[in-house]
């Protein structure tokens, strides 16, 4: 295992790569034309640091992926209706280099709900990925108690593993 990284990629056959998540977004990128794969872990902290944007830009610049032929698959994660944060998080999200307002729902109690999956999808679109090649998850880890782990929900350790390899 590689510690303290939120993204890994390979262009080599028979090497399994992946990321562990609970409520955070796991993103699996695959470009079969290269071939190459990448796994990204992005909680709200990774999102405000634009991990997906930076990773995809790097992969495109180094010709590891082609945005027109790359597919993106999202793991189950905490979704828009469940991811409540404070205004200090909103202030950080507003520093991203695109319009984030569609991904924020303000509440009267100085809290807001954010669409972490949506923010990461927008980063993929901003880098030229085709919307038809992006596959969001409909599973909300906070609500799918029988099928998903949610640290926010049960405060227990449990994780999903988003992984892949090139045959």
Question: What are these model-derived regions, one by one?
Answer:
Residues 1-167:
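Active-site microenvironment for binding and transforming phosphate-containing groups
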């Amino acid at each position: 295992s590689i510690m303290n990284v939120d993204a890994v990629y390979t262009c080599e056959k028979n090497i399994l790569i992946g990321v562990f998540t609970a409520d955070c977004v796991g993103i699996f990128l695959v470009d079969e034309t290269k071939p190459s794969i990448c796994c990204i872990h992005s909680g709200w902290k990774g999102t405000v640091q634009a991990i997906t944007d930076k990773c995809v830009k790097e992969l495109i610049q180094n010709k590891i992926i082609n945005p027109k032929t790359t597919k993106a698959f999202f793991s189950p994660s905490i979704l828009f209706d469940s991811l409540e944060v404070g205004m200090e998080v909103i202030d950080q999200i507003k520093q991203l280099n695109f319009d984030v307002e569609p991904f924020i729902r303000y509440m009267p109690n100085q809290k807001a709900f954010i669409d972490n999956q949506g923010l990461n999808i927008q980063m993929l679109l901003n880098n030229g990925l085709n919307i038809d090649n992006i596959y969001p998850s409909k599973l909300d880890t906070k609500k799918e108690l029988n099928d998903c782990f949610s640290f926010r929900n049960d405060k227990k350790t449990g994780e999903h593993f988003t992984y892949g390899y090139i045959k």
